[in-house]
Structure formats: C-alpha cells, structure tokens
Amino acid sequence: MSTPPLVLTHARLVGAARTVDVLLRDGRVHAVGPDLARGAGAGAEQVDLGGRTVMPGLWDAHTHMTQWALARQRLDVSAATSAAHAIRIVLDRLAARPLTPGTALVGYGFRDGLWPDAPTADLLDAAVGDAPVILVSGDLHCAWFSTAGLRYAGVAAHPTGLLREAEWLPLTSVVDHVPDAVADDWVAEASRAAAARGVVGVVELEITENLAPWRRRIAAGNDALRVRAGVWEPYLDRVLAEELRSGDVVVGTGGLLQQGPLKVVTDGSLNTRTAFCHDPYPGLTGADAHGVLSVPPEHLVPLMAHATRKGLTCAIHAIGDHANTLALDAFAASGARGSVEHAQLLTDADVARFASLGVVASVQPEHAMDDRDVADRHWAGRTGRAFALASLAAAGVELVLGSDAPVAPLDPWVAVSAAVERARDGREPWHPEQRLDLLTALRSSVDGQPLTLAVGAPADLAVLDADPLSAGAPLREMPVAGTLLAGRWTHRGF
C-alpha cells in the first residue's frame, strides 16, 4: 500500500485554534507543524484542508459486517409498533415485489419487547398464506417465521414460529445465505459507506469463520477498512493451526487484516428477555425467568484459559448483570485479557471489578436509545445501572465504542452522540447521570490513538467539516469531508 508523501495543509487539530500542516509518509504521520510543504520533497502531493479538522480515523469496536450488509438490502420492519403493523409492512412489500419461486422474504429490525400482540406463525400465515416470510429481530437474537418460512429454513414445525437464541442462531446460515460474490459486493458497499463516515477500522465478530472471507474480499480489492477478525469456538482450531495470535497481521492482506479475539456469547438480549440477570423479569416464571445462560462457567473458564495460552484475547458477550458477573469471574479465573461485549446491566461491585481486572468494556451507546423503553419495563428499578458508561469511566475502566451493526448503524458519530447526550428524537435524556464527556467518547472511538495526532502513528485519519469540540457541533450528523487509510483516500468529498 505504498503511496507518495501527502501534505495536508491548513489542517486544524481537534480543539485547536490555529492551523498546521500534517505530513504523511510511508503510511504514517511523519510530522505535524507549520510550513511542512516546503520540505516534503518534489513528489509530495499537497491537499489544502482549508481549516477543516483532522483527527485519528474512527473504529467501530463491534460489528457483524455480513449481517450489516444484508440488513442494508432487506425489508426494514424497524418501524413496526405491533405484530399487526409488521404484517402490514410485509404485505406492502409482497404486493409491490412478489416473491419468485424458491425465495423467501427476509425482513430485519423488529423489536417486540413492547408490542401489544405476540408475533406468531399463525398471524403471518393468515396474512401471507404460503409465502415464506422470515423477520429477524433488531437485536439478532430471534426470528419470526411463517410456516412456509420455517420449511424454507429446514424446520418441520414450531409451536409459535418465534424462534429465540439456540433455536434460531443455527438457522442463520440458511436464512443469510447468498452467493459469496453477491455478499462480497454488498460488504464492499457497506465498507465504503463506513469510510464515508470517517471509519478506518472495524472489529469483525460475524458468526462464521472470518479470516477466509476477508482474505478473499481484500484480494478482490475491498481495501476501505482495516479489519480485526474475531474467531468463534467452532473455528478456533483453524486459527490456532496458523499460529495466529490476537494482533497478528495476516500475511498477504496488505496489512489490512488482523487476528482478533475469541468471541463467546454467554447470554441473550434485553428485547427477547434472555439477557441473564440476578433478578427475574417481571411477569416471567419458570426456568428462564432470569434469562438464558448460554455458556456456563464450567465451559467458559477452560475455553478462555486455552485461548489465552495460545495468545488470543477474549471478547465475552454479556448483557444481563448476572452474565456480567460470571464473565468477570471467568476473566479472573482464567487469567484472560480482553473485553466484555455490551456490559449493559451491571452491579455496582462489578463496575469496580472491570477496573481491577483490567477488562475492557466494549459498549454500544446507541443501544441505550433503542432499549430505553424496553429497559424501563423489563428492568424496572434497575435502569440506573443500565448502560452505566459514566460509572465505568469514573472507575477507570477502559471503554471502546461500537455499534453491533446491524443492531445499530455502523456510524461512530451515532455512538458518540448517544454516549454524550443519552437522548435521541427530541426526547429527554435517559439517565443523564450516565452520560460520557465528549473527550472520553472520542478517545474511546479511535483505537487508542491520541486525538491530537501522534508522529509515527498510522496515517488513518478523518477530515471533518466541523470541530467536534466546538459548541453546537452536530455530533450525530457530523459532516465528514474525507477519510485516509495508511495515507490514501478511502473517501473524499471536497
């Protein structure tokens, strides 16, 4: 990825009053200061930023890139306020674009946690007949099938048609299947869209073997992002056979692909009432009244210890407070390093344990905006410690921000806005005492790079039409003028 030297003139660093020049050479920040163009050499390119703000490029610390690419192509049912409303959206699509034989209508984005009516196969069947319809929830933890949709996915029958967690997740390989070439084109399009928002890298936690598809995509020219590819337990032996450790650059990918962490999902989600909690969900009884523990400690601890011995960090999905307690217990028992993904509901004691154990909290602030009403109903009396970002920061916990795309948009400015404002759509802030300050939110979005640009750092930069620290800066809609990866433009709009 060798590129000629590039001088960004009249650049403004975050929070700075005066402009400087930024010299990029050999894929890194070579110098920051005044009048650098004179000594940059005859072959150097110059681009006048005209006072625009330049900062390290943004990372999304939790994505599912194929799911995100698929969601961008699927029927959007996120606006549905009831099962009946979702069915009307489905019928409108079927009327406009009838299915061709052998295909299914797949929608994405419903959240039934507050619906007045239950999503069932019978309801869908009464409306769509023999049409295979599959609607995936916004949190990816369940799906709603018509009877024909069940048959399409290879399921003979189901009592309700609403499949959650372990019933649903094995079916994603069928429901999500499209030819590699099509999926790769959609992922490339999604990658370019991310670059247009200042993104230079993602942590890829797709539920599949992630190295092979990204090797293929990069070889085919998808070079808009750096990718840190997580590995799931079924594919762990393949990574270990290559003797890859977390942080290793994968050979033959132009420095774009790194081995990421071991990913383990230990509980469910709030919307499905499967996040594993110390206290039961209101109105639920029986074995799952506290949610679902997908991976018990007796399996989790040795798995994490094994990965640690082989040089992998661990990324442990935990949403409910009991799941978080057990995840932290597992970090302590295994000696593993890494992150808890989501960390949505925490006890006060566990906030402190994140800090003492050195466990990173990988959080998705926009989920608080999506889940606030569901949390008020299903975590009533506990929401003061839900999405407790300020408490974690005050305890000295390292935070990284992400989207969990497609659960939230792959746009770090959306995450920063949600973290700082705790509000959306003109509503009052939800638990404003848990807001992050803006500097912390920005620092949690740039993969550990200093906001003021460090000499020697990768030349992965975002060029903005507004300083995010300026009063009234439009955080959620931050205008991004350009993005550079290793000193080459992946997006330029000026």
PLM features: what roles do these ranges have?
Residues 185, 304-315, 319-338, 342-343, ...:
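His/Asp/Glu-enriched, well-ordered alpha-helical/loop segment
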Residues 3-10, 14-244, 271-323, 337, ...:
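Divalent metal-binding segments
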Residues 51, 146, 198, 259, ...:
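Conserved, mostly hydrophobic/aromatic
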Residues 216, 220-256, 260, 345-352, ...:
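Extended hydrophobic/aromatic segments used for targeting, binding, or gating
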Residues 64, 256-274, 359-368:
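Non-cysteine beta-strand/loop elements that form the S-adenosyl-L-methionine
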Residues 152, 220-222, 244-247, 332-334, ...:
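Short, hinge-like loop/turn segments at secondary-structure boundaries
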Residues 22-23, 264, 483:
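Short aromatic-centered micro-motifs
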Residues 4-5, 9, 31, 51, ...:
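In a subset of proteins, long, contiguous C-terminal domains/tails are tracked
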